[in-house]
Amino acid sequence: MTTQTLLIELLTEELPPKALNNLGNHFAASIAEGLEKAQLIDGAAEFTAYASPRRLAVQIKNVKAVQADQKIVKKGPAVANAMKDGAPTKALEGFARGAGAKIEDLTIVHDGKQDVYAYEYIQTGKPLGELLEDIINQSVKKLPIPKVMRWGSSTFTFVRPVHGLIVLHGGDIVNVSVLGLQSGNQTLGHRFLSGGEITIENADSYAAQMREQGKVVASFAERKAAIQTALNEQAGRLKATVAADEALLDEVTALVEYPVVLEACFEEHFLSVPQECLILTMQQNQKYFPLLDQNGKLMNRFLLVSNLQTEDPSHIIQGNERVLRARLSDAEFFYKQDQKATLESRLPKLANVVYHNKIGSQAERIERLQSIAAHIAKALGADAAAAERAARLAKADLVTEMVGEFPELQGTMGKYYARLDGETEEIAEAVEQHYQPRFAGDNLPNGKVATAVALADKLETLVGIWGIGLIPTGDKDPYALRRAALGILRMLMQYGLDVNELIQTTFDSFPKGLLNEKTPSETADFMQARLAVLLQNDYPQDIVAAVLAKQPRRLDDLTAKLQAVAAFKQLPEAAALAAANKRVQNLLKKADAELGEVNESLLQQDEEKALYAAAQSLQPKIAAAVAEGNFQTALSELASVKPQVDAFFDGVMVMAEDPAVKQNRLNLLNRLAEQMNAVADIAVLGE
């Protein structure tokens, strides 16, 4: 059966730029999936997604004009129950009637268990035109569109008004109706550079015709690559690098159909404003690409992506420079105005900034942050006064003009203003870095003072918000407590602080009775659960569970313990020792009395005497290794007692009739368990 390329295009008004690429990929994949299910393609679909500001399209190779005929087998009642006294039962008659067949037309097939009556027939394949309309409509309905709109007098809804529909199979129009539009082969090109309607000659010629006749690069990926290449070439010529992330590049790609990269500049005096402010306004407000010199300093030149190609782009460049000049003038004004007041003098205004109506204002919060940060700094051996001062100033920039205009600059502007106020560099850096880490993979604060303030900030958020009952549930975490917990854990893995003690200190900083009394224990459990999630990114679940079963309060040696358990698990004795440890723990649960010291005089059998001697020899070795942080050595020592453990369980009845002997054997197993679990609960390995 011959096949041809299928093309579908929805011509729209300007689509949301941040959603464009996702919409295009979903639309193309959904159409391809529908064709596969309809058996209009053999094997996996080979398709290309197109997405530009005014169109979503997909081009799919090797699409059949008609489905292949199919042999259909409808299975009915079992042969054993279908005939009675040589006549068909009601069940068989009903099956034949439902299948539209006569009894004599039925065949007998085996369904894997028994012989059954069946009706076999050939179903003629449907043409593409009969199936495609529903496939397209279903694909449109399944698009990830948070908000839809209506247009004109129609009742149809879509993310933006749709004005045209192309459906071509090879060079032939496939007649379908979608969103109130009848399919055709005509579309529009670039809004300004194209000369009117374009007739697509063939599904395979779409991209070339759009580029040549319509001045549209229809492929999102192709436009993005072209922009990236042009940006790099222009920056290279200026010995600069482009300051931009993937999100900005994607957004700009979604805003243009025929990209042209141009170079522009702004007055040097604006460079007196912190470069973070200038970069943010260029990227966020204007979608420009700032340039950094070889020292990472902002240059007074930038790159922009135009949607127009002209012989003389000077008017485009000048227009963009004029718009940016106004933006930068605003930033310069805010910066100068903010310098008229110190951070310290701004603190009273924080009393009017509500943090949460149940736990007070930012001013009240600062009081807590100061005490928590000073406590943590002392524990870290850092300058407690510097940490307290940084915590006092940490939120002062929230009431500045610049942060009011650009909330993303909170902390950053605090650093600059702290420097201007004569604060030490350590304090200024801590003011900025106390928000770190902001997200997974973000840098940790640099230095102990900054770490103390960052820990205080996140602990106060976690304990305070949790304590008033705003606990994360499912995918709802409006106060980002999970992110705060992960940030705390990442920092604590660098420093030897007691996590439970920090939680209690933070809880005690709130007015008595304000927070739920269970908050310390609940947040500690929450942190433990988040820690498991964090560690399972790098280690198997059973190894993480073994280490965390000990409920470690210090996290700075976690990595060493995890690596040690991973190495222990590879030992030939590991599986047997893990099983023995589990058996020991189960026996210890049956103890009637409090477990204590082993009484050598009550050791009766050679196997228990040998195990006691081995445990006695093992204890100082493991204690010394753990004290020195040599966890792998501590665990590897366990391999030496495997013969004695095996012999003990093979030859000794732990739950002896004599209560004293039984208790003594349980005491022996308890001593063994303490040594086996000194680093981790090895019983859970392999579970």
Which sequence ranges carry the predicted segments?
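Amphipathic alpha-helical "coupling" segments that flank catalytic cores
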Residues: M1-E687
